């Protein structure tokens, strides 16, 4: 075997090991972490479909509805901007979904500028401040899909947000496979650059 082939093989093996470690971290974090009753529930946005929230986003919203049904004083921040191919902001579509399911409008607050998970959290912290909450001291629960919880926890820690995390399962195997594999690379990006 030539020297360049050996180097290529070593690099390939190192890349596979790195991907395996990242995927292991994603999988290990796919569980709810609930340690307190939240005063604020932040629901992270996701891509909209032409007729409203995607199935994965609906699951996030349903998870949030389940939580707030047993926490009647918790306020909800729905976070997500408007993508170039989306008919409205993710936050507005999420608010509409919650309202259609009987959630009181005074409990729902929109953060409609975020375009990334880090922005979802950072901008939602600003909404919390505008509502009179201290993001560092206030009990918070962040809702996303289960594949996304490891990175969500990492970003919360880096932003100083002490938050529980609630994960909704993915609606089907195909989207789960894609999301879990994509998340390993997103985790690497945030580990290195955020």
Predicted regions and their residues:
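Generic low-complexity, intrinsically disordered sequence content enriched
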Residues: 13-16, 69, 102, 191
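N-terminal membrane-anchoring alpha-helices
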Residues: 1-39
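Short, intrinsically disordered low-complexity segments
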Residues: 2-5, 59, 188
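A structural signal for short, hydrophobic/glycine-enriched beta-strand patches
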Residues: 23, 27-180
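A transmembrane-helix-recognition feature enriched in membrane-embedded lipid enzymes
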Residues: 176-194
């Amino acid at each position: 075997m030539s020297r360049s082939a050996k180097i290529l093989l070593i690099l390939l093996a190192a890349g596979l090991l790195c991907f395996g470690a990242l995927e292991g971290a994603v999988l290990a974090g796919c569980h709810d972490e609930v340690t307190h009753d939240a005063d604020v529930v932040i629901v992270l946005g996701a891509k909209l479909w032409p007729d409203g929230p995607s199935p994965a986003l609906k699951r996030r919203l349903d998870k949030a509805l389940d939580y707030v049904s047993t926490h009647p004083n918790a306020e909800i921040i729905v976070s997500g901007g408007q993508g170039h191919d989306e008919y409205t902001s993710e936050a507005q579509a999420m608010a509409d979904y919650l309202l259609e399911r009987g959630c009181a409008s005074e409990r729902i607050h929109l953060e409609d500028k975020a375009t990334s998970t880090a922005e979802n959290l950072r901008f939602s912290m600003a909404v919390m401040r505008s509502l009179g909450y201290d993001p560092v001291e206030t009990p918070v629960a962040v809702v996303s899909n289960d594949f996304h919880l490891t990175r969500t926890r990492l970003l919360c820690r880096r932003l100083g947000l002490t938050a529980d995390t609630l994960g909704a399962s993915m609606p089907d195997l195909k989207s789960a496979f894609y999301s879990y594999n994509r998340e390993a690379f997103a985790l690497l990006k945030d580990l290195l650059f955020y």
